[in-house]
Amino acid sequence: MQKLTILGATGSIGASTLKVIEQNPDKFSVVALAADSNVEKMQQLCQRWQPEYAVMANKEAALRLKMALAVLAPNTQVLGGQEALCYVATLEQVDSVMAAIVGAAGLVPTMAAVKAGKRILLANKEALVMSGQLFIDEVEKSGAQLLPVDSEHNAIFQCLPQTVQGNLGRCDLASQGVSHILLTGSGGPFRYTDVAELEAVTPEQAIAHPNWSMGPKISVDSATMMNKGLEYIEAKWLFNASRDQLKVIIHPQSVIHSMVQYLDGSVLAQMGEPDMATPIALTLSYPERVKAGVKPLDFTQVGELTFLQPDFERYPCLALAIEACYLGQHATTTLNAANEVAVAAFLARQIKFTDIARVNDSVLNQVCKQSLASGLDSLESLLELDRMARTLADEVVRERAQ
């Protein structure tokens, strides 16, 4: 029986994880559930799963949850704050940690789980975007096992040899006969929209993803293709890939979740319904496979599969992310912070959809001019840079909102 802590239990990844566990009650059990501030949802989950621990990052939310669970789940211990997140991520009885807290907030508890040598089911892409080398070094030092949950990285993982699967972050792709990793993305809801019309896009339009069911932030990132940009950075670290080895391809149907091209001309592709339960099930059970509650792909209903080159005029955020990836850690940490602020401002109707890329570009330029590439050798220094970039982004948002 594998024992789990789920960081980000009230989000879409948390829901899919619990769906897989429900399919396999003899294989997995939930020790701790953690979330940010959604008390109502957490209350329902604690009633259903009766975990040993329930943690809210927001301490006020934790107090409200504690009162609600006094009768509904009296055996569940309720804790609050970031220290509590780290505590349940490192519990001795926990084997695996689902790291699914969105954004920079997930970095510290995920890193705590890594240092504790846990099996890390990595859904929080910001952990690698913000702290790439530091994160990979800690994984190696602690002996933690790293398994990618993101559908694209999970697809790539499945298409790679076992020697690479067991050596993420340190592998040599060329020595394994790999020529290219082909990272696919749907292109979001605006792949055929006239570029001139993107300025008028509303939050409601941006979060209506054609294929996947996701939270609002990641849906906007998918519309700008910043999501693919962050995944590009993540893939660089996970698979130790060079710029020449990593390519982005738009695949509107989201049937192929990514591919690996080999030196002999072979291409291995992982295909399936666009349902996060599939990659989650694999990371939970690896190297075995278990039921995920996902219907099998019906090839007679798939129709045509199409592939396009990304248009960087339509997707400036993708271009920025690829550029930042090779500028260094200071650039990717900055871009991630600026983007979180910009997307939140867009969702709050403070800036236009096309301003997201402008905010990101402005903050990235400001930070890169300050020569901050050196000295980012600790989690604290990265978090300080993250704070600085957010402050700069807030200023740019205020300017654009006037």
UniProtKB/Swiss-Prot annotation:
Cofactor(s) needed: Mg(2+); Mn(2+)
UniProt catalytic activity: 2-C-methyl-D-erythritol 4-phosphate + NADP(+) = 1-deoxy-D-xylulose 5-phosphate + NADPH + H(+)
InterPro entries: DXP_reductoisomerase (IPR003821), DXP_reductoisomerase_C (IPR013644), DXP_reductoisomerase_N (IPR013512), DXPR_C (IPR026877), DXPR_C_sf (IPR036169), NAD(P)-bd_dom_sf (IPR036291)
Residues that coordinate or bind 1-deoxy-D-xylulose 5-phosphate: K125, S151, E152, S186, H209, S222, N227, K228, E231
Keyword check for Manganese: yes
Gene3D superfamilies found in the cross-reference section: 1.10.1740.10, NAD(P)-binding Rossmann-like Domain
Gene Ontology molecular function, alphabetical: 1-deoxy-D-xylulose-5-phosphate reductoisomerase activity; manganese ion binding; NADPH binding
Source superkingdom: Bacteria
Residues annotated as binding NADPH: T10, G11, S12, I13, N38, N124, E126, G215
Keywords associated with the record: Isoprene biosynthesis, Manganese, Metal-binding, NADP, Oxidoreductase
EC number(s) stated in the UniProt entry for this protein: 1.1.1.267
GO biological process: isopentenyl diphosphate biosynthetic process, methylerythritol 4-phosphate pathway involved in terpenoid biosynthetic process
Function of the protein: Catalyzes the NADPH-dependent rearrangement and reduction of 1-deoxy-D-xylulose-5-phosphate (DXP) to 2-C-methyl-D-erythritol 4-phosphate (MEP).
Record family assignment: Belongs to the DXR family.
UniProt xrefs under NCBIfam families: Dxr, PRK05447.1-1, PRK12464.1
Listed name of the protein: 1-deoxy-D-xylulose 5-phosphate reductoisomerase
Gene label: dxr
